[in-house]
Amino acid sequence: MVKNKNAVKGLLVLGGVGTAAFSVYTISKKYAKKLLYRHHKQEDRPSILEAKYSSKNITIKNDQDIQLRGILIPKENPQETVVILHPFGLQAKDMQLYVPYFEEHLPEAQILLVDACAHGQSDGYIRGFGIKDINDLVCWNNYLLDTYGKDHKILLYGKEQGANTILNAAGKHVLKNVKAIISDGAYTSPYDIIGYRLEADYKISKYPAISIIARHIKKAVHIDLKENTAKYVRHNDIPTLYFHAKEDEFVPLKMVYPLYNKNRGKKVLFVLKDEKYLYELVENDDFKQTLSQFIKKYMK
C-alpha cells in the first residue's frame, strides 16, 4: 500500500514537471512568433522630420522584391550621407532625436533614416534580427552610390539591432565607401540578448526557453540566433566607434567588450557614465568631443 502511495506521488510529481515543461515550451513558441513576425503595420504619422527638416520618403526594393522605406533629409549637391538604423521593434521616425547631433557634426551631409524590413513603413512581416537585414543594408548602400556617385562618402550609425546589422555587414566586406561606423549599444548575438531580456523582463529562466525559441526561429525561417557579431568584427576594417551607456537598461555593458576586443580594424571604445542616449549629451561632455574628433578624422 505504501509503495502504491509512493508510486501515485511519483506520478503526480512527474505530471507536474510535465505540465511545467509543456507550459515553458508553449510560452517559448508563442514568444518566438511574437519576435519573428510583424502582425500589423503601424500608421505613418507626421513628425518633426517633415516639419523641421523637409524630409521626403524614398523606397527601394531588396533582393526579395520587398519594398523598403527610408526617410531622407536632403542637402544640395551632397557629398556624404549619414545612415541611421533603429533598434528591434522600433522604426525610423523613433530616431528623429538623433538627427540634430549629426546635423551639428556633419552639416553638409544628408541624413537617411531607414525602416528595417517588417518595421515602420517598410513591407515584409518576417523580422531579420540583424542577420537577414545585412542584405537590405547593402541595397541601401548601393542605392546611395548609384544615386550620388561611387565616391559618395557614407557614415553608418546604428542603435542596438541597427548597430549589429552594420557590424555584421562590415565583417562580411559587403559595404562600399563606408568611411566610418558608430555602434551604439550593440550586443553579442540575438541569442544572448533575447535570453537576457527573458530573465530581465519576464523573470523567466533563459534555459530552456531561449533554446526553444532559437530552434523554432531557425526551423521557420533559417535564421540562426547564435550568429555572433564578435565573429564578424574580427574581419571589420572600417573605423568603428563603439559606445555604450554604463547604465544601459536594455543591453548590458558587458556585451560591448567582446565586440571591441575582437574588432580587427581601427576602433574606439567610449562608455557613457551618466547619459543613456546620444541626444542627451551636453556641450562639454567628453564623449561629444570624442565623437566630433572621430567624425572629423574619418569623414574629411
Regions found by a protein language model. Give the residues of each.
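Alpha/beta-hydrolase active-site loop
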Residues: 127-148
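Hydrolase active-site cap/lid region
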Residues: 168-222
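An N-terminal hydrophobic leader/cap segment in hydrolases
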Residues: 8-61
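The serine-hydrolase catalytic nucleophile loop
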Residues: 88-102
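Catalytic histidine-centered segment of alpha/beta-hydrolase-like enzymes
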Residues: 275-288
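Short beta-strand/loop motif that positions the catalytic acidic residue
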Residues: 235-236, 242-244, 248
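Conserved alpha/beta-hydrolase
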Residues: 99, 103-123
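Short alpha-helix in the alpha/beta-hydrolase fold that links the catalytic acid
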Residues: 98, 238, 252-261
